[in-house]
């Protein structure tokens, strides 16, 4: 069984620094919505400040553009901020345009991608096909939101876990966690 890793999700730098001191926290994720809620308007400045304080754990920063070409440009800027940066790319934009080609391009260029907002087996399969198997990557499956609509997220997470056996550099992230029990469920999916 793989070891469970805990990622703290947020945009409050002081809280992130506190969590950085906790042994159980493996890394961090944030996104434009969380930052907007805290009134953060200088995304690049925020990212640089976080990275100046958190140096030894992975941090996933999400692109904020809805245009796929601009997502690519932003991803390269984020990638260049540090070796511990993963670039979050949503599996589709708000126009429901898939980003699999973008994920493939970035991954092929050596960008550590955190493909996010995955809900379905199709999303998972297409992202796995897009990722460079020689580059560390994360797929963030919104298991909590799957559960919110009354579905059991475990089969979806188990499906992804099976695929990681063939892609050992790809990790699955049980995203949108709602309950402590989700840790038990995640452990059961291996």
Q: Where on the chain are the PLM-derived regions?
A:
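Active-site beta->alpha loop and helix N-cap motifs at the rims of alpha/beta catalytic domains
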Residues: 2-17, 21-25, 29-109, 143-146
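Catalytic alpha/beta core domains of metabolic enzymes, predominantly
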Residues: 97, 101, 111-190
